[in-house]
Curated annotation (Swiss-Prot):
Assembly mode: The methyltransferase is composed of M and S polypeptides.
GO biological process: one example: DNA restriction-modification system
Pfam entry (one): Methylase_S
Organism: Mycoplasma pneumoniae (strain ATCC 29342 / M129 / Subtype 1) (Mycoplasmoides pneumoniae)
Record protein name field: Putative type I specificity subunit S.MpnORF638P
Source taxonomy: Bacteria, Bacillati, Mycoplasmatota, Mycoplasmoidales, Mycoplasmoidaceae
Gene Ontology MF annotations: DNA binding
Keyword terms: DNA-binding, Restriction system
Database matches in InterPro entries: Restrct_endonuc_typeI_TRD, Restrct_endonuc_typeI_TRD_sf, Type-I_RS_S_subunit
Annotated Gene3D superfamilies: Bipartite methylase S protein, DNA methylase specificity domains
Purpose: The specificity (S) subunit of a type I methyltransferase (MTase); this subunit dictates DNA sequence specificity. The single R subunit has multiple frameshifts and is probably not expressed.
Keyword flag Ribosomal protein: no
Similarity-based family: Belongs to the type-I restriction system S methylase family.
Comment block on domains: Contains two DNA recognition domains, each specifying recognition of one of the two defined components of the target sequence.
Length: 375
């Protein structure tokens, strides 16, 4: 039987300062010559993701750390030994009988916004250890209740971790397959029975395959948090919804300016093409397998982004987009056969991303309900 969760209305909750529960230790500087691309250990410093790898380590697994310089306030619980850089600090539980390690991690995660607010500085933000030690942390007195709460939240994290592994595997496989397909790797073509590509693969400009349309400006009051048709602008993700789409499904789009310039999207349902985007509708829908061109453009995406970002005022005009050369196969059947191999991997990748995003939202919502708000 699953134990009943103790919500934040429970009278057994109290609060203690971070310094009374943990021993804090600042990380160490890692010399550049100790960085190794194939090193045994990850090196975490001031970023959420690893800053590199090394063959040295200074922190054991199952250690909590907080970033105090850079992405200030981010709380991490390592599952492997690693090197903790000087822009992070480690937290060691002083009394394991008073606070469970996993519960401690989630208690700190529930206070990330407050931890982040401790950062000071003009250009480079930092958190002083003295300020961190005075931060109040929510604590439920019963160690068993702590473990019950930690278990409920860790179920989500285990699934999210598994999804992240699947995302990485599918991303690598998709990129590997795309490279082999569009470089006409002989072994790959033999394996998938795509020999005809040797004779049929050529190049064509986007303007010869697609009708390109610039995005349309839409007032804020015409966009909604929920709805049927997604709105896409200059960001990778949909930011809102609209009542009426201006572009049909089975279409592509390219981000025309801003930080994400050159990013390619495939839309399976009708959508609204907003400011900062270029929509691409097939000129001959019955003779164009759109996912094939999506996979081709995704394969080219990194080079396209680098090319456009080199410009003084990065912006992709309709003319420039229409002149982009992409791999082309005249046979619709061959487009479909080749494109599906890559597209199905990309689709699985996106499904894993969506599930992970949804679970993170549910977990964070539960985190807020389980832990009380401290004054």
């Amino acid at each position: 039987m699953t134990p009943k969760l103790k919500l934040n209305t429970n009278s057994n909750w109290t609060k203690k300062t971070l310094g009374s529960l943990f021993e804090l230790k600042k990380g160490e500087m890692l010399e550049k010559e100790l960085l190794a691309p194939d090193g045994k250990y990850e090196y975490f410093n001031g970023g959420i993701k690893a800053s590199g790898r090394t063959n040295e380590f200074n922190t054991f697994k199952n250690t909590i750390s907080i970033i105090i310089g850079g992405s200030c306030g981010y709380v991490r619980l390592a599952d492997k030994d690693y090197f903790c850089g000087q822009s992070s600090c480690t937290l060691t539980v002083l009394d394991p009988l008073e606070i469970d390690l996993k519960f401690a991690y989630y208690a700190l995660k529930s206070q990330e916004e407050k931890i982040t607010s401790l950062a000071s500085g003009t250009t480079i933000k930092n958190i002083r250890l003295s300020d961190l030690k005075d931060l109040p942390i929510p604590l439920v007195k019963s160690i068993q209740d702590q473990r019950t709460i930690a278990h409920a939240l860790s179920v989500f994290d285990l699934r999210i971790e598994h999804l992240n592994e699947l995302i990485e595997v599918n991303r690598k496989l998709r990129d590997e397959y795309a490279h082999k397909l569009f470089t006409l790797d002989p072994d790959f073509l033999t394996h998938w029975n795509l020999h005809e590509l040797h004779e049929q693969m050529g190049e064509i400009s986007l303007g010869e395959v697609f009708h390109l349309k610039s995005g349309k400006y839409l007032k804020a009051d015409e966009r909604f948090e929920d709805g049927k048709f997604p709105y896409y602008g200059a960001g990778i993700e949909s930011t809102s919804f609209v009542n009426e789409p201006n572009t049909k499904g089975d279409t592509l789009s390219m981000i025309a300016n801003g930080y994400s310039i050159g990013n390619i999207r495939y839309h399976t349902i009708p959508w609204f093409n907003g400011t900062g985007g270029i929509a691409m509708e097939a000129l001959k829908p019955n003779k164009t397998y759109v996912p094939f061109f999506y996979c081709a453009l995704k394969y080219m995406q990194k080079d396209l982004k680098e090319r456009f970002k080199r410009d003084e005022s990065p912006f992709i005009s309709l003319k420039l987009a229409g002149e982009i050369k992409v791999p082309f196969v005249k046979s619709f059947a061959l487009q479909r056969k080749a494109g599906k191999i890559i597209y199905l991997l990309d689709k699985t990748l996106e499904e894993c991303k969506e599930e992970a995003k949804s679970l993170i939202s549910i977990r964070d919502n539960l985190l807020g309900k389980l832990f009380p708000t401290l004054s």
